[in-house]
Amino acid sequence: MDIFAEWQNGGTELRWRSTTAANDSREVAVFSRRCGTPGAPALVLVHGFPTSSIDYFALAGELSSEFDIFLLDFPGYGLSDKPPAPHIYSLYDDARLLVYAITQVWKLTEYRMLTHDRGSSVGMIALEMLAAQDPPAVPVDLILTNETASVSTSPA
């Protein structure tokens, strides 16, 4: 079996409605994958542009004995739906999706998060959203790689 088929076969689908007004609450299928060791410390891996969660194939394999790993492909990327035009792709919409996956789908309360490239911008925005929740749902550790956004996480 090739890497792509193996990655796809290990995934599931979650449904997401865009929260960007211009997208008219259009629902999309989002590819989600959980791998590693259930019950081990949770690790959320967030992909960059123009890639997908499969970028983490080798890393997930290396870390699978030490972590319970959670990943998704943002809409328009990888194995998730490619919404038709005039869909607006938004860092904030992707951050809301990430928060939804962490808190509602995966139900993580203690986790680490590693982000890359555009995923770091999404991760920083999500961090602000997670910090505003009651109780806050921020990661224990956050590792940003190629981060380009600067978002305040302190109360105004």
Where are these regions (language model features)?
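Alpha/beta-hydrolase fold catalytic core
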Residues: M1-L43, S64-F67, Y89, W106-K107
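Active-site loop/oxyanion-hole signature of alpha/beta-hydrolase fold enzymes
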Residues: T19-V28, R33, F74-L114, E128, ...
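Conserved HGGG/HGGXW glycine-rich cap/lid loop of the alpha/beta-hydrolase fold
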Residues: F31-L79
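Short, hydrophobic alpha-helix immediately C-terminal to the catalytic nucleophile
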Residues: F57, V99, M124-E128, T145
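Residues at the starts of beta-strands that form the adenosine-phosphate
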Residues: D68, E110, V138-D141
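Gly/Ala-rich beta-loop-alpha elbow adjacent to hydrolase catalytic centers
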Residues: T115, G119, G123
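Flexible "cap/lid" loop of the alpha/beta hydrolase fold
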Residues: L127-A156
